[in-house]
Regions:
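Membrane-spanning alpha-helical segments of multipass transporters and channels
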Residues: 1-207
Length: 207
């Protein structure tokens, strides 16, 4: 057990992933998950996916730098492991960006955004960020292990306060799986979208 210096160390592990998730949503409002120009080339699905993900991740790195700089130097948040906090926060940003890229690519811009907002609402109530998940209704306790923000909160709580045990490495493994799995699905979807059909060449008219 590690000692927290104040409320900041207690609430930061919840609000930092929340900010990163919302930041990822805004990023994909500004950028195309699958660039149209890349889809029109013979590039593989992975290259098309990375053509969308890399610029988004660059914005994610900038967001992490600004966010951690503000909470540490501006608000005085104590970081027991600065390197660990930076590295883990970058992993969280990558996982959230890849997950949202995948949802938007697979479901489409409109349905994808609805799914992202629904996922955000579920994670706010079930991640155990502000109070123990054991005190929440049974539904939220049941979905807690299946939502990425649960592991983002747990991992950040450990690297910020200095408690490094198996839960941190489980969180790293799960978020890495989310990031790589999402990128793989997006690459598959990009490959499918490069196959032109009559419906895509001649879309139905809506009056």
């Amino acid at each position: 057990m590690s000692r927290a210096e104040g409320f900041g160390e207690g609430f930061a592990p919840f609000f930092l992933p929340l900010a990163l998730f919302v930041g990822a949503l805004i990023t994909w409002l500004l950028l195309r998950p699958l660039p149209t120009r890349a889809l029109a080339t013979p590039a593989s699905g992975w290259r098309v996916t990375l053509a969308g993900f890399v610029p988004a991740m660059a914005l994610g790195v900038a967001q992490v730098a600004v966010m951690l700089g503000v909470v540490h130097y501006g608000l005085g948040l104590h970081l027991s492991s600065a390197v660990g906090t930076i590295g883990f926060t970058l992993l969280v940003a990558a996982a959230f960006l890849a997950l949202q890229q995948m949802l938007t690519a697979v479901l489409g811009p409109a349905a994808g955004k609805v799914a992202i907002l629904a996922l955000l609402m579920l994670q706010l109530a079930s991640s155990g960020g502000t109070y123990p998940v054991e005190t929440t209704p049974a539904f939220f306790r049941a979905i807690n292990p299946f939502l990425p923000m649960s592991y983002a909160v747990t991992g950040l709580r450990q690297v910020i306060t200095g408690t490094l045990d198996a839960r941190l490495w489980v969180s790293v493994a799960v978020l890495t799986f989310v990031a790589l799995g999402s990128l793989t699905i997006t690459a598959w979807r990009a490959g499918r979208m490069r196959t032109w059909t009559l419906d895509r060449l001649h879309p139905a008219l809506a009056i």
